[in-house]
From Swiss-Prot:
Alphabetical keyword list: Cytoplasm, Lyase, Tricarboxylic acid cycle
Name of this chain's protein: Fumarate hydratase class II
Catalytic activity: (S)-malate = fumarate + H2O
Comment field (misc): There are 2 substrate-binding sites: the catalytic A site, and the non-catalytic B site that may play a role in the transfer of substrate or product between the active site and the solvent. Alternatively, the B site may bind allosteric effectors.
EC number: 4.2.1.2
Chain positions recorded as substrate binding sites: 100-102, 128, 131-134, 141-143, 189, 321, 326-328
Subunit: Homotetramer.
Organism for this UniProt entry: Prochlorococcus marinus (strain MIT 9313)
Disulfide cross-links: none
Protein's cellular compartments: Cytoplasm
Gene name tied to this protein: fumC
Site (Important for catalytic activity): 333
Top EC class, one word: lyase
């Protein structure tokens, strides 16, 4: 009875049983059996990008005379269905497989071949009218097709998802910066009291940190637009028409609306993946910025009654199973964990990028998985961060004013008038005796009360005045 649920598929290794109803074939089945490692599946974004490559390649191969029109049309129809996500359940392979990504490339080739067979009432696995290698993979090698798919999926994820979300997060912090421009607060360096600034100025730093990260990520795309497709096995273009890479890149640019081009030096973009490593590094830089911002927000909101408590963060859910009424900065904590995860993923990509040998880097699935996973993590985290926290942050004006008035570092404004040493003496006396700065200054006789009130004005200390 079990035999009725299986079919026999053939490849260069011989025969193998494959579940009767699935669209994948022999090579995919072998990978499933040999690499049942964890549950990390190849990202569907990469599968869709590979399908776009097959679609574009079929069109170009026909135009260049190495594929007939029937084969072209069958491949384009099936590949378009795969690229649109209609058959995502037919791509079960794990990330942890051969380092070239060959198994996943063949998974796509086999599914497209079998979709064509279905459409023509041919048996699954018959390779009629379209063969997975001879036709779907025509003029390609996994060595150029798989990294091309990573480039495409990464550019799409960054351009269509991550960058627009960052722009909204930048705008959210910009609105806070504008709204808080009149709130003067005490600054802190070394986690100790420092001179004043406005809460708006503090928020402007968060805004511009993210804006700088946005700019760096956007700039990294320049290295991802050139595609290795057309280099085939080692970059020479063996078994591909001379214009295949150039024309297929142009076709992919047309399909995606993104400025892809054919890499001038296929050897460089196939033997190494520096552009992908750089893009991942810029995601790490974004994570570093978001981690710092989350730490700032947690510190400024700590309390609510026994901490800094300068900010009120939105209260979204109970924070403790034992302490009634406790609310935690959970969005900051989630963001911090995402940031640390991305930083770790970047370390793996960096090692993988430098570990290629000669004409081939055999860490492609890891690089692609970590890069695309990081894009997804950062996009999702930034979206929830903005909607569930940043938009709802409110200042605690009473606490901010109280702390400002208590700070000894306002004495810094006196230093240009009476000198550093005398200003220090005022601060030490005030701290030791519990005096206000004004009381200490007048007691020591270093400044008149009129001059003190004129000089030690927090509103005048938030910008250069000499």
């Amino acid at each position: 009875m079990m035999a009725d649920l299986m079919r026999i598929e053939h490849d260069s290794m011989g025969t193998i049983e494959v579940p009767a109803g699935v669209l994948w074939g022999a090579q995919t089945q072998r990978s499933l059996l040999n690499f049942a490692i964890s549950t990390d599946r190849m990202p569907v974004e990469l599968i869709h990008a590979l399908a776009l490559i097959k679609q574009a390649a079929a069109s170009v191969n026909c135009r260049l005379g190495v594929l007939d029109e029937v084969q072209r049309d069958q491949i384009i129809k099936a590949a378009s269905a795969v690229a649109s996500g209609l058959h995502d359940d037919q791509f079960p392979l794990r990330v942890w497989q051969t380092g070239s990504g060959t198994h996943t490339n063949m998974n796509v080739n086999e599914v497209i071949s079998n979709l064509a067979s279905q459409a023509n009432d041919e048996p699954l696995g018959s390779h009629r009218p379209v063969h997975p290698n001879d036709h779907v993979n025509r003029s390609q090698s996994t060595n150029d097709a798989f990294p091309t798919a990573i480039h495409i999926a990464a550019v799409q994820g960054i351009t269509n998802n991550l960058l627009p979300e960052l722009e909204q997060l930048i705008a959210a912090f910009a609105r806070k910066s504008d709204a808080w421009s009149d709130i003067i607060k005490i600054g802190r360096t070394h986690l100790q009291d420092a001179v004043p600034l406005t809460l708006g100025q503090e928020a402007s730093a968060w805004r511009d940190q993210i804006a700088s990260a946005h700019s760096r990520i956007q700039s990294s795309l320049i290295e991802l637009y050139p595609l290795p497709l057309g280099g085939t096995a080692v970059g020479t273009g063996l078994n591909a028409p001379a214009r295949f890479g150039q024309e297929t890149a142009a076709q992919l640019a047309s399909i995606t609306g993104l400025p892809f081009s054919s890499a001038k030096n296929k050897f460089a973009v196939m033997a190494s993946h520096d552009g992908l490593v750089n893009a991942m590094a810029q995601l790490r830089m974004l994570a570093v910025a978001l981690f710092k911002i989350s730490n700032d927000l947690r510190l400024l909101a700590c309390g609510p009654r026994a901490g800094l408590a300068e900010l009120h963060l939105p209260e979204n859910e109970p924070g403790s199973s034992i302490m009634p009424g406790k609310v935690n900065p959970s969005q900051c904590e989630a963001m911090a964990m995402v940031c640390l995860q991305v930083i770790g993923l970047d370390s793996a990509v960096t090692m993988a990028g430098g570990s290629g040998h000669l004409q081939m880097n055999v860490y492609k699935p890891l690089i692609g998985f970590n890069l695309l996973h990081s894009i997804e993590l950062l996009h999702d985290a930034c979206r929830k961060y903005r909607l569930a926290m940043v938009q709802g942050i409110e200042p605690n004006r009473i606490k901010i004013q109280h702390d400002l008035e208590q700070s000894l570092m306002l004495v810094t404004a006196l230093a240009p008038e009476i000198g550093y040493d005398k200003a220090s003496e005022i601060a030490h006396l005030a701290h030791e005796k519990g005096f206000s700065l004004r009381e200490a200054a007048l007691k020591l006789g270093y400044v008149s009360k009129e001059d003190f009130d004129r000089i030690v004005n927090p509103a005048l200390m938030t910008s250069a005045r000499l």
